[in-house]
Amino acid sequence: AEARDKPKGYHIDYANPARMTIPQTNFRMGYFINDHYNISIGLDHMKYVFKQNQIANVSGYVNLPASDAGSIYNGTYDNTPIDFFIIFNPDNDNNPPPFLTFEHTDGLNYINTEISRMDDISSKLFKSWNSDKIQINVTEGLGAGILLPKTNTRLLGKDRYDEFHVSGYGISAKAGLNITFFKHFFIQTELKGGYIEMNNIRTTENKADKAEQNFWFLQRIITVGGI
């Protein structure tokens, strides 16, 4: 099945503390062990949205009680195409519930620890450069952590489930360029990629119901901060 993230572009919400977690936003804080290495913890508030207007192949077996709204999907599926585009109104019995709606729009919430290295290249490129005023650095790092999504899902007509739950783990690597001003303020651009394994995603209020998924991700990040 296809899914995508939910970019918001350049928006004032990124500068509004009351709304900055609505778009995809990252937060990180850390400590420099020495001039080159630092360790940090952070939250990558990425989003994952299942493409509802699609046909996907389904394999498995559904056997719900006839009284359940989702019993219309009872049967055996062997790579069977299912149309996920169903407009559902719970007050209209003529519209059946969708087979599945699924998204992590309140965040994939990759909570991770990173170890990074930073090297000053401005003094090497420009011999007379005053790095006390503006310092240009390259940075790279590795990270790992857990996934704490607030998954919004509705499966086979069951009640919607939308709660935070530890659902898996992730690993990541990054590389970027850092510009530090007067040794205290910086702007940093990064490319960050990684792998996410989610083997315990809650899909209904019943703890026995769960889903699994894994995927690769790539982020383009612009960060402002202080030292």
Language model region names:
Residues 119, 132-137, 147-153, 157, ...:
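Extended, basic/helix-rich recognition subdomains
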